Every structure is written in C-alpha cells, then in structure tokens.
Amino acid sequence: MKLLVVYDVSDDSKRNKLANNLKKLGLERIQRSAFEGDIDSQRVKDLVRVVKLIVDTNTDIVHIIPLGIRDWERRIVIGREGLEEWLV
C-alpha cells in the first residue's frame, strides 16, 4: 500500500523519534515532516501503533494517507534545492 505520512509534532525529541521509526518501517523522507512509501497492511498497523506511542494527541497531529499508485504517479514535484541540508 502506498502511503503518505505528514506530521506536525512540537517536541524535537518526539519528532526525531517519529522520523527514525518511519525510516525503520521503510518509509522515505520527501519533506521535512513528510514521508512516503510502499508498505504492507501489517506494517501499517505497526505504523499506527508506533505513532500512538510517540505523539501527544493533545498537541501533535499525524496524517496517514493511503494513495493509489495512479495518484502518486500524477503528483507534481517542484524543486529539490536545499533538501540535503536537513537530511541527516
């Protein structure tokens, strides 16, 4: 399943922990607070469980958006400059 995960997490430590877990689950960072990837249904369940453990639902928000492959292929990407600056 193709997923887009977008988040706004206020705490630096939690935000870094979330990003590291998204990478471990096989997602790729495409923006500072956005990841995408193809993962199976079990990993989606793992993703939801991990997100619930990390974020504070009173102050943070995470969108997990399933995408059809045709939608993803029709995406428009403008620019790439500066991406490597914050990818560590």
UniProtKB/Swiss-Prot annotation:
PANTHER family xref list: CRISPR-ASSOCIATED ENDORIBONUCLEASE CAS2, CRISPR-ASSOCIATED ENDORIBONUCLEASE CAS2 3
InterPro entries: CRISPR_associated_Cas2 (IPR021127), Virulence_VapD/CRISPR_Cas2 (IPR019199)
Keyword flag Metal-binding: yes
Subunit structure, interactors included: Homodimer, forms a heterotetramer with a Cas1 homodimer.
Cofactor(s) required, per the database record: Mg(2+)
Biological source species: Saccharolobus solfataricus (strain ATCC 35092 / DSM 1617 / JCM 11322 / P2)
Keyword Repressor listed: no
HAMAP family xref list: Cas2 (MF_01471)
Binding site for Mg(2+): D8
Keywords for this protein: Antiviral defense, Endonuclease, Hydrolase, Magnesium, Metal-binding, Nuclease
Gene Ontology process terms (BP): defense response to virus; maintenance of CRISPR repeat elements
NCBIfam families attached to this UniProt entry: cas2
Stated family: Belongs to the CRISPR-associated endoribonuclease Cas2 protein family.
Function summary: CRISPR (clustered regularly interspaced short palindromic repeat), is an adaptive immune system that provides protection against mobile genetic elements (viruses, transposable elements and conjugative plasmids). CRISPR clusters contain sequences complementary to antecedent mobile elements and target invading nucleic acids. CRISPR clusters are transcribed and processed into CRISPR RNA (crRNA). Functions as a ssRNA-specific endoribonuclease. Involved in the integration of spacer DNA into the CRISPR cassette.
Gene Ontology MF terms in the entry: metal ion binding; RNA endonuclease activity
Full protein name: CRISPR-associated endoribonuclease Cas2 2
